[in-house]
From Swiss-Prot:
CDD domains linked: Ribosomal_uS17
Coiled-coil boundaries: none
GO molecular function: rRNA binding; structural constituent of ribosome
Similarity comment: family membership: Belongs to the universal ribosomal protein uS17 family.
NCBIfam families xrefs: PRK08572.1, uS17_arch
UniProt-listed InterPro entries: NA-bd_OB-fold (IPR012340), Ribosomal_uS17 (IPR000266), Ribosomal_uS17_arc/euk (IPR028333), Ribosomal_uS17_archaeal (IPR019978), Ribosomal_uS17_CS (IPR019979)
Organism (species): Methanosarcina mazei (strain ATCC BAA-159 / DSM 3647 / Goe1 / Go1 / JCM 11833 / OCM 88)
Protein name: Small ribosomal subunit protein uS17
GO biological process: translation
Amino acid sequence: MARDIGLNIPAPSEECDDAYCPFHGTLPVRGQILVGTVVSSKMDNTVVIERQYMKMVSKYQRYEKRRSKIHAHNPACISAKVGDIVTIVECRPISKTKSFVVVKAEVPK
């Protein structure tokens, strides 16, 4: 049985026994909610998400493209793949580089 994580995101249909799953485990989520694209899923239960955004350069009064990469935990019930558009939520630090967890994955159109 999936628990309510406090967001308007439906629980995944699959069950998992991951302790770090916000739906089936005991991991509380809080803080930032971000959307990005999965660029790597080679690590065990981890995905790398890339976010692209525009930054204003005040000297030239123009915008420049920037990007950032974030490591996030990928529960077995969600199992996001490369190219998926995912929603990640901040949580407590899971490891040295992971402080986010994937809560929703969509296949791009």
